[in-house]
């Protein structure tokens, strides 16, 4: 798996704050477990399809990419690209710009559940290694 970076722009491709989104909140230097502390691994993402087929995606409409990313980094390193690969255009009415507090809370609860399941799996894996 590889996670890249992108640049935030307006509809006319003028840079918008915060500019480049490179997901430096988690890096190889701070370890795979740091991915459990963030609310997503970022975009864009690319997956090694043969491995992905052995893991599978959760059958949900939110957070499935995060769940798979956590599962992958349990055993494999995730590659990083810090240079922007594309521009992400933002404008008023963008679908992810105005989520209700109820939707944000539901999304966060689900991601907390994903982290809990992954943490439990890592504890089991480490116990079996002893």
Which residues does each predicted region cover?
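Non-catalytic N-terminal targeting/anchoring module and adjacent flexible stem/linker
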Residues: 122-130
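Short, flexible, mixed-charge acidic loops at enzyme active sites
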Residues: 15-25, 101
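Conserved nucleotide-sugar donor-binding catalytic segment
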Residues: 28-115
């Amino acid at each position: 798996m590889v996670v890249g970076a992108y640049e935030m722009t307006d509809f006319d491709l003028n840079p918008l704050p915060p500019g480049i989104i490179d997901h430096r909140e988690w890096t190889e230097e701070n370890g795979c477990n740091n991915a459990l502390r963030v609310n997503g691994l970022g975009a864009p993402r690319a997956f090694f399809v043969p491995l992905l087929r052995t893991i599978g995606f959760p059958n949900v409409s939110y957070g499935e990419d995060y769940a798979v990313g956590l599962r992958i980094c349990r055993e494999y390193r995730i590659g990083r690209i810090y240079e922007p690969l594309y521009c992400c255009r933002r404008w008023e009415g963008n679908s992810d710009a105005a989520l209700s507090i109820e939707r944000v809370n539901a999304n966060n609860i689900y991601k907390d559940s994903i982290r809990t399941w992954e943490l439990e799996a890592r504890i089991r894996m480490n116990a079996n290694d002893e």
